[in-house]
Amino acid sequence: MFTGREKELQYLNDYYEKSGTQILVVYGQKGIGKTTLLEHFVEDKDCLYYEAISCSTRQQRVFMASHLGDMGISMPEYPEFEELFSVIEESKGSKKILVIDEFQNMCKTDNEFFEALYDYINREDKKDMFIILCSSSIGWVENSMVGKLGALSRMLSGFYKIKELKYQDFKAHFPLFSIEDSIGAFSILGGVPGLWQYFNDEFSLRENIESFILQSNEKLFDYGQQYVAEELRETAVYNTLLGALAEGKHKLNDLYRHTGFSRAKISVYLKNLMQLEIVEKVFSFDTEGRDNTQKGIYQIKHPYVHFYYRYLFPNQTKIMFWETDEFYDQFIAPTFKHFVAGCYKKVCQEFLERESALERLPEKFINRGEWVGKKGNIDFIFQDEEEEILAGICNWEKEMLMYEDYQLFMECQESAKIKAEYIILFSAGNFDNRLREEMKKNPKLALVSLEQMG
């Protein structure tokens, strides 16, 4: 099922229509849907697709020649890149597209591929092509690639990052889930469609976890650790840090006390994890109350990596010997609502962004964020050009949002030194009567239930 990528598809088509040879780097995390997007883009076009693997440059050329041979194109056994490019451009018809998937494997050892590509695109007699260089190595593309290529990077036409899909796309993909199970499943799989294939909305969320995560023969069983190991060495160190973060050790000092690693070492490894978008540093919305915020907070950003290190990583032995239903009751059920709560905040923020795009909010908001205080949090702050603010909280864990929670929110406003012109309180549970009465008296206060979010 191809969903939620209409904007990306249009972007590629617009690039294709440009005159001259274009070289576009398309990148994003593994499973984000890059290959599926490209398959839809080239389905009515003249395209050669090749997936590079980790090997020598000479072997890479041999594999490319073999691929062309399978298409009925005669090639020498050990061709040069120049010969490969020449054969590709000789095809008749519309503008040729060359897609090199996981192209970082072509150039991490040397620049021979890019040097040959540079020579090709500067030939006077060349035909126009659209060359797409695709990669799952986010950290390498954003932090190392240009330095590795040097002056050769100037031939690149642009970079296009494929981001996670939204909750609404996830919900459309799994229409049979209840809204509670839908948000819970999204907190595990996130907006990574490559992971969606492993869940089935004909079953409950619990049944999906027990059947497709807690079984040692299933792909998701050790996917979290495999995902980390693909990009990083010294996995013992990274596993320890991720396990500590998943356990709730979010500050540098907490990680230092828990792991025994030096602060300098922890900082370096956290930086590497952030470059790969596995971990993120939490920043509060900038207000006059910055002295009342918590600083230096780190958390796991990748949803499935978070779930894996929270529930599977510390309980490997128990998973192997306990029945799955017993394991779920003992180790997942007691804290799962708290785990989902962070995702629910993002779903609420996405709802507000959608309402804003449809002009259903009182103002057009241009800045947004959250405020993490020492005595309480403001889950979202939206600010317009006139610096008017819409803010609120998102309750997932409590069965009922109480008037006292509203009062705490108002105290957090004072600590943040802001005054929200509009307040929205989201709750997966009910609202108490006092809150409902307050809403009747205050036209700038709104209460939003799960059902109202659609």
Could you say what each language-model-derived stretch is?
Residues 25-27, 109, 119-149:
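Sensor-1/coupling segment of RecA-like P-loop NTPase cores
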Residues 142-238, 242:
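Interdomain motor-coupling "hinge/lid" segment immediately C-terminal to the ATP-binding subdomain
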Residues 201, 207-375:
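Accessory nucleic acid-recognition modules appended to NTPase machines
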Residues 424-454:
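Domain-level recognition of nuclease-like catalytic cores that cleave nucleotide substrates
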Residues 20-38:
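Walker A/P-loop nucleotide-binding motif
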Residues 352, 378-402, 409, 423:
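Conserved catalytic cores of phosphodiester-cleaving nucleases, focusing on short active-site segments
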Residues 44-50, 54, 58-76, 89:
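Conserved NTP-binding/hydrolysis module of P-loop NTPases
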Residues 91-113, 117:
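Conserved P-loop NTPase "ATPase switch" module shared by AAA+ and STAND
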